[in-house]
């Protein structure tokens, strides 16, 4: 099977998107069972970032789980997640900071670094602003230390953006962002043991490119994030 991470629903979405073949999910499920085709995805519980110890700025939860958007750059979500790679018995970590657009679910910008620190988040934000000049979305995050410091809040104000934050220990308040981490890790990371940092970094970069341009989503009308984005721009 070329893409062992795909279950029957995603296989059906690909048939519709790539080949204009329209059948119901149950038929695809029957075929998969008859041919012993099943997804190799492994599931794992996700952690939840809690409030920084000494937050300098706390914003209200203005997003309030309203995960819909009428246009690109109306609402952005952000977060940082970690990945491990191994060198003998030594465990190393790298960190991925990303910003997701709620309209088309595209990854607007991302940065990979060796440290989970303020510069990682600042660089991600700066990349997003540079790629989307004039954008003034509602900017939502958890209450991690990177997002609750005055410097970051000032960067948002300077860009004309309004800040929103999840409540403490309420991962669902940043649900679509957490969901993206889950998708990435289930499809390309869990069940694997990376022993080379470059291989892990290349995997992340390749997956984000695949996610934005090739991975169709049913909630986007069986389109990829970039197809949804370009469809709006062409309207």
List each language-model region with its residue ranges.
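Basic, flexible linker segments flanking DNA-binding modules
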Residues: 1-71, 170, 224-233
